[in-house]
Regions:
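Short beta-strand scaffold segments in enzyme catalytic cores
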Residues: 1, 12-17
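C-terminal solvent-exposed extensions
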Residues: 3, 7, 22, 26, ...
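Solvent-exposed coil/turn segments that connect beta secondary-structure elements
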Residues: 5-6, 18-22, 32-35, 77-80, ...
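Extracytoplasmic
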Residues: 8-13, 22-30, 56, 67, ...
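Extracytoplasmic/secreted envelope proteins and their assembly/folding machinery
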Residues: 12, 54-62, 77-81, 85, ...
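Second-shell loop/turn segments in exported
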Residues: 43-51, 64-71, 126-134, 147-152, ...
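Amphipathic, coiled-coil-like alpha-helical scaffolding segments used for oligomerization/assembly
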Residues: 50-110, 173, 177
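Flexible, polar/acidic helix-loop-strand segments at domain edges
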Residues: 85-162, 170
Length: 214
């Protein structure tokens, strides 16, 4: 998830299921206003975050998904932007021209493939939640694009260096020990034919590809 630097707004929140047996990583992004019930306490995802921080947000997402996620990570806006810049930006494809300006958000992008820095990418994530932006599923698609770019042999060769520059600054329960345990899995993902899919509902996170939508 990513929150504003003031921690009063959720920019995006998503659950990820890496199903390597089926060769697919599925991502479900949620609108921050989505209601979640934690042991009878009903509130929006943003409300749960304001009440109990990252751990409460994780519980809220777990309740929506119907399973308990192994790990969580939450960044502030500046941490997200810095992470993308450390990784030399992100390559995105913009389907049509975007010219959007309000007091809260200003974004201008031309159509086509382009490499953007962290600030522009975060604005794009935020734009997705505007009426014309495509919604949370579009945010999920952007996350899939990022995963497919960054989980590769080039980045993994310097994985520990990137970990120390990025993960160590986040609000997360992912440790360097966890990263070490996952290095083989990440290498297998980088070497294999992994499909990254943005799904529209939490229930689809655990449904095998052949049965999805039935």
């Amino acid at each position: 998830a990513c929150v504003s630097d003031e921690k009063d707004e959720l920019y995006f929140v998503a659950a990820v299921n890496a199903d390597l047996d089926s060769g697919e990583v599925r991502v479900c992004a949620f609108d921050p206003n989505t209601s979640a019930d934690i042991s009878g306490n009903k509130d929006s995802l943003m409300g749960h975050y304001k009440t109990g921080g990252s751990k409460e947000l994780k519980k809220a997402v777990d309740s929506l998904c119907g399973f308990t996620a192994d790990k969580y990570a939450v960044s502030t806006a500046n941490q997200f932007k810095n992470a993308i810049n450390v990784l030399s930006g992100a390559q995105i494809s913009v389907p049509e021209r975007i010219s959007y300006k309000t007091k809260e958000l200003s974004l201008s992008l031309m159509p086509g493939n382009q490499t953007v820095k962290g600030e522009t990418l975060l604005k794009y994530f935020r734009y997705c939640l505007t009426p014309s932006g495509g919604g949370a599923q579009k945010q999920g698609e952007l996350l899939c694009v990022l995963f497919s770019q960054y989980i590769n042999k080039t980045y993994l060769a310097s994985g520990r260096n990137y970990f120390s520059q990025i993960i160590d600054s986040l609000d997360t329960d992912i440790s360097i020990v966890d990263f070490s345990r996952c290095e083989r899995t990440l290498s297998a993902m980088a070497a294999g034919d992994i499909k990254y899919t943005s799904v529209s509902s939490a229930g689809e996170l655990t449904v095998t590809p052949g049965k999805r939508g039935k």
